Each structure stands twice: as structure tokens, then as C-alpha cells.
UniProtKB/Swiss-Prot annotation:
Annotated S-S bridges: C151-C171
Pathway stated in the Swiss-Prot or TrEMBL entry: Glycan metabolism; pectin degradation; 2-dehydro-3-deoxy-D-gluconate from pectin: step 1/5
Stated family: Belongs to the pectinesterase family.
The species this protein was found in: Actinidia deliciosa (Kiwi)
Key words, A-Z: Acetylation, Aspartyl esterase, Cell wall biogenesis/degradation, Disulfide bond, Glycoprotein, Hydrolase
A single GO BP: cell wall modification
Protein name: Pectinesterase
Residues the record lists as binding substrate: T84, Q114, R226, W228
N-acetylthreonine modifications at: T1
Length: 321
């Protein structure tokens, strides 16, 4: 469905031409525990506010004017006294949340440690053509089932992290220029029990350097992930990896912590960063060409996409391709 075909329930505009001038006011106006979709159209502009879609605010949809046009921005960080969890510019818990055409940013900067742009703990949440801009801990895929399609994610350290069941499909993941003596790590998945059906699935994505990193690529090492928790689970499937990825591919968290219990897989990736000949030799890591091993990480199997995503009117494929 084209954005123009979706009729919003309320409009947010900085210039007063809508129903509200802040996103937060529009969220507050949504009926609690709604089974019907409530659409908030957020007109182009930069909204400097912290937005909380709590568990009572179900089936909300944010529609913006596109990446780089509609911005929600904040700068909370751990250095400035917030917890990682509370540092998020936008936090979503209400089930059935959809965002489309919005840039979420935490502009605290690379010296402020953890500073989250968006945290999702919303089951059945989906993000289409959105961007997530930060440095350390940009995108907190906190918990439950979530889907990201045609999104751009920018960061430095552990910038896609958490313990959701998350699939990123056809997204662009960009490592930025960190501080001196810092490394870039795309993921830090937080599964702490082998029975949890959680993980980060990177499917048919581009793994690349952001514009500010390109001229200084040789000064910084960049890795696909590191194990935040003991049973960390992350897969890169059919993705295109630029040359920024260190030949080892993956980084330890602390000594040999989790190296036997983690589950990291690479499957049929392409590009100069996908060369696996010098990869780590941890017991929990493997390169696989076995489709039956990775089929569990598709939208259909990993997050049961056929039960909910197909009604969201956003492009999705349930299988590997």
C-alpha cells in the first residue's frame, strides 16, 4: 500500500497544521488496548522528544515522510546518568507496532557510551523504510518478535543488540567512525538461556562502512558480532559484506566467555568481507552451506511471519529468498 493510501487517524506537525505538535501527544491520544490500527502521520521535521509507546498502546502505526525527513531525536546516554534501557529516544512495548518512513536518532555521540535510538520490546512489531542512527547501542531489539525491512542502521559498538527474535531483511547496516581505540561491532545478541527462541537474523542485508568511516577504514577494526550473553545467537544469511569486516569476523566478549555455547553462523554471504578462510575457530561458530540448518531463521519460521506480518502491507518474504 502506498503511504498516500493510508488515512491517518491523527496528524503531527511542527508548524501547527496537524492535530498535535508532538509525537508524544498523539500517542497519548490513542485509545488504550485498541484492536484496531491507530495511524499517526508525523509530518516532515525534527521532533526533539522522548516517545514511549507503552503496553496499553496497542496496534499503533507511525508514518513519516521518509528517512531523513521525519526525525525523532534525543541524546540520553549512560555517561549522562541514564541506564541503557532508559536511554532510548523512542521505546515501543505495545504489541502490533508499525513504523514506516521515519528516522530515529540518538545524537549523544561516540564518547557517551550506550545511547539507544530505538528500543523495541513489542511483539509483532515491524519497521519499514526507517533509519536508526546512533553510535554505541543504536538499535535495542529488546524482546519478542520483530521485523525490519529496507531499513538503515548506523552505529559503532554493539549497535544491534538485545534478546528479541529479530529478522532484518533487505536492510543496510552501516558502521560509523568510532572514537580512537574503539572497535565497531555490528551485533551483540543477548540470549542467556539455551531454551530461548531468540536471536538476530541478518538476511539479504548489506554490511558496509558509513561515509565517515570510509576514509579511515584502516584505522579501525570492525566485527560482525560478539557474545553479550552466554547463548548469544546471530546469523548472517545471503548478505553482502564490504571489505571493512576483519578477517576473523567475530570478536570475544571477555576471554573465552560463551565461545562454546554461542551460536554464530554465516551462510552464503558475498562480497570482500565475506571471506571466511581466516575466521575464528570457536566451537559455537561455523560457516554453513546447509539450507536446512538456516531455514529456521527466516521470517516464516523464526518470527512466525505468516501469522501476522502478511497483513501489514509491507514487503516481506517468508523464506530465505
Amino acid at each position: 500500500t502506498a503511504v498516500t493510501d493510508i488515512v491517518p487517524d491523527v496528524v503531527v506537525a511542527k508548524d501547527g497544521s496537524g492535530n498535535f505538535t508532538t509525537v508524544g501527544a498523539a500517542v497519548a491520544a490513542a485509545k488504550d488496548s485498541s484492536t484496531a490500527r491507530f495511524v499517526i502521520y508525523i509530518k516532515e521535521g525534527a521532533y526533539f522528544e522522548y516517545v514511549d509507546v507503552d503496553k496499553k498502546k496497542t496496534n499503533l502505526m507511525f508514518i513519516g515522510d521518509g528517512i531523513g525527513k521525519t526525525w525523532i531525536k534525543g541524546n540520553r546516554s549512560v555517561v549522562d546518568g541514564w541506564t541503557t534501557f532508559r536511554s532510548s529516544t523512542v521505546a515501543v512495548v505495545g504489541t502490533g507496532f508499525i513504523a514506516r518512513g521515519i528516522s530515529f536518532e540518538n545524537y549523544a555521540g561516540p564518547s557517551k557510551h550506550q545511547a539507544v535510538a530505538l528500543r523495541s520490546g513489542a511483539d509483532f512489531s515491524a519497521f519499514y523504510q526507517c533509519s536508526f542512527v546512533g553510535y554505541q547501542d543504536t538499535l535495542y531489539v529488546h524482546s519478542l518478535r520483530q521485523f525490519y525491512s529496507e531499513c538503515d542502521v548506523y552505529g559503532t559498538i554493539d549497535f544491534i543488540f538485545g534478546n528479541a527474535a529479530a529478522v532484518l531483511q533487505k536492510c543496510n547496516l552501516y558502521a560509523r567512525k568510532p572514537n580512537e581505540n574503539q572497535k565497531n561491532i555490528f551485533t551483540a545478541q543477548g540470549r542467556d538461556d539455551p531454551n530461548q527462541n531468540t536471536g538476530i537474523s541478518i538476511l539479504n542485508c548489506k554490511v558496509a562502512a558509513a561515509a565517515d568511516l570510509i576514509p579511515v577504514l584502516s584505522s579501525f577494526k570492525t566485527y560482525l558480532g560478539r557474545p553479550w550473553k552466554e547463548y548469544s545467537r546471530t546469523v548472517f544469511l545471503l548478505s553482502q559484506m564490504e571489505s571493512l569486516i576483519d578477517p576473523a569476523g567475530w570478536l570475544e566478549w571477555s576471554g573465552d566467555f560463551a565461545l562454546t555455547t554461542l551460536y554464530y553462523r554465516e551462510y552464503k554471504n558475498t562480497g570482500p568481507g565475506s571471506n571466511t578462510t581466516a575466521r575464528v575457530t570457536w566451537p559455537g561458530y561455523a560457516v554453513t552451506t546447509n539450507e536446512t540448518e538456516v531455514i529456521q531463521f527466516t521470517v516464516g519460521n523464526f518470527i512466525q511471519g505468516s501469522q501476522w506480518l502478511t497483513s501489514y502491507n509491507i514487503p516481506v518474504y517468508l523464506n530465505l529468498t
